[in-house]
Amino acid sequence: MKIRHLLNLTIGQDKGLMFSKDIKQLPTDTDFLYYILNYDINHEPGTHFVYNNAATYLLCAITQKITGQYFRDWIQKELFNEMGVTLGEWEKSWQGICLGASGLKLKNSDMHKIALLLLNNGTYEGKRLLNKEWISLMNTPQFFTANLPDYIKKQGRCINKMSYGFGLWICGNGTFEYPKTHYFCDGTDGQLLIVSPKDQMVITILSHQKDMNPIYDAIRYFFD
């Protein structure tokens, strides 16, 4: 298993782990690292995609081991201070490892700044903060995800999860029939960060809504 497999969620497990409902069912003193690393690997890493919060947790654990800092504190200092973004509380396991994929408190105005950083290929207000090639790699399809035409018909081109990059869903898969259009992050119950390079536009939404159809309808107004 390599860092690349953690980033594109192809670590080889048959199901995603570390979702909120899963965590609630585990004993409160569960060692999540032991739990993840001893869970069955059913596929060669890099060959099977499944959305999996465990991969992000492992990335946070590795970063904390290397830097000696809590992940939230490290990325705040190394990146977000330069942008005027303030990360709120970020939930951690009882071992002190940042959950990574969930539990972050963040204002919509700050999430919008992150979207602009992606749109501008790693620059913010004219200052280079991230490597342009890295941003390109993030939003390049690394793995195709489903029975694509049916999926598109169900949700519409503007918000389909046709492929996955590094930490980003990508609309389209880069083929002639389904060209890559925009890319996005999608959190539970309506947390969305959408980047459209073609339209030079970003959309960020923070909500708490089980029925996502009204939100999708509003997004289609801009993209369809």
Residues of each region from the PLM?
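Active-site-adjacent helix/loop patches that line small-molecule binding or acyl-intermediate pockets
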Residues: M1-V85, N108-G122
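Residues that flank catalytic or metal-binding motifs in active/ligand-binding sites
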Residues: K2, G100, K107, W134, ...
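Structural recognition of the beta-strand scaffold that forms the well-ordered cores
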Residues: K2-N8, E89-W90, L116, I194, ...
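Solvent-exposed loop and edge beta-strand segments that line ligand/cofactor-binding
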Residues: E44-Y51, L99-K105, C185, D189
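Active-site-proximal binding-pocket segments
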Residues: Q76, F80-T140
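Active-site Gly/Thr loop motif
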Residues: V85-L87, N139-V202
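A short acidic/small-residue loop/turn micro-motif
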Residues: Q209-D211
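Short, gly/Ser/Thr-rich active-site loops of penicillin-recognizing serine hydrolases
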Residues: N213-D224
